[in-house]
């Protein structure tokens, strides 16, 4: 569907944070979206919380995995189920600013851009914003990304009508970086918005999270 954004969210034992994550999507000023949350066999109350949220907003749906597959495979399963031309990524313990999608989709459609990302803010485990903002450069090519892997997955939007279909590679780590390189290798540079539209939550190593998954 034209200009529909499919938001891909892997979830693993994120009961403490999933409400903030999903509510930040529901609060978006841009309303043409669907959110696909893949629960990767959580052992906490994540599924119950997601079910409650999906009952509030029909644009949210959950895919429950019976075995643990890891974040890359969870994202790939969601990609196969996604209906949108635009694909966005948001981990279950992160959250967006309300105008994130509106600003990013407008930017991409006006300039016919295939791959964009934004600056993002580091938050505490409780979600309090710090002064630490990871600033997005205006443009990143394949060669420059090899030297500076600055793209935050929680900020990325890709127009797959332009890039063609894609999946995350089945590797143990850095699968997002590998995918960005693949997209750039196809000839699509990544363009950055300097405003921070997303919030990256730092979780302690004692908590099980998709960031550590």
Segments the model singles out, each with a brief description of its role:
Residues 1-27:
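N-proximal low-complexity "stem/linker" segments adjacent to membrane-targeting elements
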Residues 87:
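Short aromatic/hydrophobic "clamp" motif used to bind/position activated sugar donors
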Residues 91-95, 119:
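The conserved acidic donor/metal-binding loop of glycosyltransferases
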Residues 136-213:
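Conserved nucleotide-sugar donor-binding catalytic segment
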Residues 24, 39-48, 67, 91:
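A conserved acidic beta->alpha catalytic loop
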Residues 99-130:
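Conserved donor NDP-sugar-binding/catalytic core segment of glycosyltransferases
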Residues 16-19, 44-52, 75, 95, ...:
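Acidic helix N-cap motif at the loop->helix transition within catalytic regions
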Residues 65-82, 103:
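Glycine-rich, basic loop-to-helix element that forms the pyrophosphate-binding segment
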